[in-house]
Amino acid sequence: MLDFKHFKLLYKEITGATTKTPKKEATLNTILENQEYSKNT
């Protein structure tokens, strides 16, 4: 399970709330990170 803090970070990435990366790229990175995170839990 994702903890709430991590979920909020994912949500910020997906909605493009972070201005560092373009929306599509951020979403792709988030998906990849989420897969890694899921493996580790």
UniProtKB/Swiss-Prot annotation:
This is Putative uncharacterized protein DDB_G0290819. It comes from the Eukaryota.
